[in-house]
Regions:
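Short beta-strand/loop motif that positions the catalytic acidic residue
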Residues: 184, 190-192, 196
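Catalytic nucleophile-loop/oxyanion-hole region of alpha/beta-hydrolase
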Residues: 59-85, 90
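Short, surface-exposed "cap/lid" segments of acyl-processing enzymes
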Residues: 3-59
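Gly/Ala-rich beta-loop-alpha elbow adjacent to hydrolase catalytic centers
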Residues: 93-97, 101
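Short glycine-rich catalytic loops that host catalytic nucleophiles or stabilize transition states
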Residues: 54, 218-224
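Short alpha-helix in the alpha/beta-hydrolase fold that links the catalytic acid
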Residues: 36, 186, 200-209, 220
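Active-site nucleophile loop of the alpha/beta-hydrolase fold
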Residues: 116-126
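Catalytic active-site module of serine/aspartate enzymes centered on a nucleophile-bearing elbow/loop
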Residues: 223-260
Length: 260
């Protein structure tokens, strides 16, 4: 059995009848979204589930045995479990976790009441990543992409190396999800740092313009980089995401899925 890094464990916090699935990003771990999940639970009383995606929070060697199908499957399993026991179900996620958030909302609209993707790639990757993927032959690994954080002294628990084969899997997931964005009809709060060195900020505008929900909001962060859930705007994110989900609950007390 592969050892899980300390701090990268999945977590679950039982609260009220509002369930929130919180998804971490590529090469990262639940450490990056633990404060978000805990904050949503403590401040709003939500029940929170945060799975550890396959190949994450262990080692790059372990990650190389996984791909986007595994990450999507784990996220979907957690969503279905949450939807089976909660009246309202919301999804939020950081980076690739945000992409998975969009993917789930597009494919499983009957299970998701609203979403809040944070720094989600859903179109363009950085030029640096595109150049690596275009190399022939491509390197086996490149330096890690974690800890793009503006706040001093804050470090993300993420791999120091990024398997290029898995980066290619992310690229496929992003492309597939981009083609599904028009199927998203639930309320959405899209969150993006204006200065992000991992995911081009233009992705947020592309997401907002592509999805077909009647309630789409865009929150720009002015004091954070990519890992915004650990950065200077982390409390703002908790308040805005929690407030947004609470607003959706108030508008449809029986749950959007029940109304459908």
């Amino acid at each position: 059995m592969v050892a899980i890094l300390k701090g990268a464990e999945p977590f679950s916090l039982e609260g009220n009848d509002v369930g929130v699935l919180v998804l971490h990003g590529f090469t990262g771990s639940t450490q990056s979204i633990r404060e978000l999940g805990t904050g949503l639970h403590q401040r709003f009383g939500f029940s929170v589930t945060a799975p550890r995606l396959p190949g994450h929070g262990t080692s790059p060697d372990d990650m190389e045995t996984t791909g986007y199908h595994d990450w999507v499957r784990e996220a979907e399993t957690a969503l279905r479990e949450l939807a089976g026991r909660k009246r309202h179900v919301f999804v939020t996620g950081l980076s690739m976790g945000g992409t998975l958030t969009l993917n789930l909302a597009a494919r499983l609209p009957d299970l998701v009441d609203a979403i809040a993707p944070v720094a989600a790639p859903a179109g363009l990757l950085t030029e640096a990543f595109a150049e690596v993927l275009a190399m022939d032959p491509a390197p086996k690994r490149i330096p890690g992409i974690g800890s793009d954080i503006k706040a001093p002294g804050v470090k993300e628990l993420a791999y120091e190396e990024t398997p290029v084969a898995c980066l290619r899997e992310v690229s496929v997931l992003v492309s597939l999800t981009r083609d599904l964005l028009h199927r998203i009809v639930c309320p959405a709060l899209v969150i993006q740092a204006r200065e992000d060195h991992v995911v081009p900020a233009v992705n947020a505008s592309q997401i907002v313009n592509a999805i077909r929900s009647d309630d789409v909001r865009l929150l720009w962060l002015n004091n954070s980089y990519h890992v915004a859930t650990l950065d200077n705007d982390k409390d703002l994110i908790i308040d805005r995401v929690g407030g947004f989900f609470s607003e959706v609950v108030k508008a449809a007390p029986a749950g959007r899925r029940a109304a459908a």
